[in-house]
Structures are given as C-alpha cells and as structure tokens.
UniProtKB/Swiss-Prot annotation:
Keyword Signal appears in the UniProt entry: no
Stored PROSITE patterns: BTG_1, BTG_2
Organism this protein belongs to: Homo sapiens (Human)
Protein name: Protein BTG2
General function of this protein: Anti-proliferative protein; the function is mediated by association with deadenylase subunits of the CCR4-NOT complex. Activates mRNA deadenylation in a CNOT6 and CNOT7-dependent manner. In vitro can inhibit deadenylase activity of CNOT7 and CNOT8. Involved in cell cycle regulation. Could be involved in the growth arrest and differentiation of the neuronal precursors. Modulates transcription regulation mediated by ESR1. Involved in mitochondrial depolarization and neurite outgrowth.
UniProt family annotation: Belongs to the BTG family.
Coiled-coil residue spans: none
Keyword Phosphoprotein tagged: yes
Post-translational modification: Phosphorylated at Ser-147 by MAPK1/ERK2 and MAPK3/ERK1, and at Ser-149 by MAPK14, leading to PIN1-binding and mitochondrial depolarization.
Keywords: Phosphoprotein, Transcription, Transcription regulation
Length: 158
C-alpha cells in the first residue's frame, strides 16, 4: 500500500535533488537563483511523480519507476524542470554526465555514473522495522554475526 503522503519521501527526494543541483552547480554556469528554482520545481515534480509508487514496506517495489536515468538521452522529468529555468537540452547534456543512474527508494538514494561505475550511496536510513529491534541481514552483519540465527525444528517419531 502506498502512503501517498509527500512527507514520507522528503528526505530521499531532498537527497536526490541536492545531488542533481550540485552537479549543475559544479560547472558554474547556472546562477544560485536559477538553481534554487530548479531544486524547488524538481522536488515538487518528483513528489508528484512518486506519490503512488512509494512503498516503504517494500522499498524495491517501484524502483524502476522511480529511477532517474540519463543514458545519452535526458530523463524527461529533469528535462521538463530544467526548461523552467531556461536550460536547453544541449546545455543540460553539457552540465550533467552522459550516463547517470539515480535510484530514489524508500530509505536509500544511490547513484552510478557510467555503465561500469561504482554505486555510491547518497542517503541511507534504517527502515522502521529495523529500528524497532527486528534484525535484517544487513543489521546482523553490522552487529558482527557471520550468519543469521538458525531455528531448529525437533521432530519425534516412534
């Protein structure tokens, strides 16, 4: 069940927007005022785009839909928002990597530049279940366990 509330995904969207804005900022071709408008518009666009595709109880569900992708072709959401601040397609292609994948999922935002690049995590938060004492595989590794606890079933036969 999707929560449908924009506030549930604000940290993840803020991380994605901040990352994309920083990529535009590094070239120095976009003014801070235009970046501010871009960031606000992108935050709104992503919140609207993801609102029925956000599943905190199953973070990987809908991941492909939420993925922001530039593969020599500009992601349509980035393209639309950039046009609001007067950035053309050729300008966008000069400012952003030619290959970028940005995954915006509940509890984690990560990216990869290039097809063979390493995946880097921008934002990570423990799911609510993990913070309530339930051990996930990842949490067990962090706690130093080499494998999950084993449950044994004893059967008695006569």
């Amino acid at each position: 069940m999707s929560h449908g509330k924009g506030t549930d995904m604000l940290p993840e969207i803020a991380a994605a927007v901040g990352f994309l804005s920083s990529l535009l900022r590094t070239r120095g071709c976009v003014s801070e005022q235009r970046l501010k408008v871009f960031s606000g518009a992108l935050q709104e666009a992503l919140t609207e785009h993801y609102k029925h595709h956000w599943f905190p109880e199953k973070p990987s569900k809908g991941s492909g839909y939420r993925c922001i992708r530039i593969n020599h072709k500009m992601d349509p959401i980035i393209s639309r928002v950039a046009s609001q601040i007067g950035l053309s397609q050729p300008q966008l292609h000069q400012l952003l990597p030619s290959e970028l994948t940005l995954w915006v999922d509940p509890y984690e935002v990560s990216y990869r530049i290039g097809e063979d690049g390493s995946i880097c995590v921008l934002y990570e938060e423990a799911p609510l279940a993990a913070s309530c004492g339930l051990l996930t595989c990842k949490n067990q590794v962090l706690l130093g366990r080499s494998s999950p606890s084993k449950n044994y079933v004893m059967a008695v036969s006569s």
